[in-house]
Regions:
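Residue-level signal for pocket-adjacent positions within structured domains
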Residues: 37-39, 292
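Cytochrome P450 fold signature focused on the C-terminal beta-domain
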Residues: 40-41, 126
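N-terminal signal-anchor transmembrane helix
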Residues: 41-52
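Hydrophobic membrane-insertion alpha-helices, especially the h-region
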Residues: 18-37
Length: 302
């Protein structure tokens, strides 16, 4: 009799263990799929997006808008060339939206790479097909009359750079000259562009100027070296005069214009590198006192 009861209890315990194991696996699978395809969370360590996002904020990122990404994690960790696929999304990214993306220059400034563990959060200033400029530290997109980025910060930077002494300090600190750091453009964070953002299918005729601003994009798309010699351009040794882009590109800017490593310095961002749109601050912790900033919890990012 006792043996039968023991067997019964053991059978019930095993059943419950199996049920709990299956439930745990199901919850884990749902959580993992949600992280890949629906949403994810990122902690922000710097002040480059102040005041919209401050150090210690944890932002919730919507991946549904443009679609979740699929790529080989092993290749990403080994820094091998990646094929990144994106699921069909519900919409498109817009100017002034805050986006999270993989930083495209983790190793070298003259070559696009991919670091699966290094994420940036910036505001989208310009879209594929836009022509972006910076005039007196203020962002402009041709044909668009709305404000772009943090206007107060741009006003402050413009006033700061009126002083020749301040400009000299920025030059010495390496924060005045802008992408592509080439004498053919001479662009700075004060006066930049115009720069056309290629969209998939766009054709450009190569010249010295376009070579300077698009070389790294073409090399990333083709995985071949683009060189210039005596006014001619060679892709992996074969002369080319025109190039058709196969990807879309974005121009990103931090709200804190004084301290933001963004497209002003490193150039254009391939769409495949974008994780998604930062929608809310789901929690925030003061890094000095370790206290929760309750006034920022679940705050909408605008």
């Amino acid at each position: 009799m006792m043996k039968e009861k023991a067997k019964k209890y053991l059978s019930v315990a095993i059943d419950w263990l199996l049920y709990l194991s299956v439930a745990f696996l199901c919850v884990s699978a749902v959580w993992l799929l949600s992280q890949v395809f629906l949403f994810s969370s990122f902690s922000v360590p710097t002040d480059s997006m102040t005041p919209a996002i401050v150090p210690g904020d944890c932002v919730l990122v919507n991946k549904v808008l443009r679609g979740g990404r699929i790529f080989n994690l092993n290749d990403a960790f080994d820094h091998k060339p990646l094929e990144i696929a994106r699921l069909r999304g519900t919409g498109k990214f817009r100017r002034n939206e805050v986006l999270v993306f993989n930083f495209p220059y983790p190793e070298r400034w003259d070559s696009i790479g991919f670091d699966v563990m290094r994420y940036y959060v910036k505001r989208c200033i310009a879209l594929p097909g836009d022509t972006v400029e910076i005039r007196n530290a203020h962002y402009r997109v041709r044909g668009y009359r709305g404000e772009l980025g943090n206007i107060d910060s741009q006003n402050s930077l413009a006033r700061y750079m009126r002083s020749e002494r301040n400009r000299d300090e920025m030059i010495k600190g390496g924060s005045f000259k802008a992408y592509p750091l080439d004498s053919v453009t001479g662009w700075t964070v004060q006066e930049f562009g115009p720069l056309y953002l290629p969209a998939r299918g766009d054709t450009v005729r190569l010249d010295r100027h376009r070579y300077a601003v698009y070389r790294n994009l073409i090399e990333w798309e083709q995985r071949k070296k683009l060189t210039a010699h005596n006014g001619c351009f060679y892709l992996d040794g074969s002369e080319i005069n025109y190039y058709v882009f196969t990807h879309d590109y974005y121009f990103m800017g931090g709200d804190n214009c004084y301290n933001s490593q963004d497209s002003r310095y490193w150039g254009l961002l391939p769409e495949e590198y974008i994780v998604g749109k930062a929608t809310r601050i789901w929690t925030s912790k003061n890094r000095v006192t370790d206290e929760i900033r309750w006034d920022r919890v679940f705050k909408k990012i605008e």
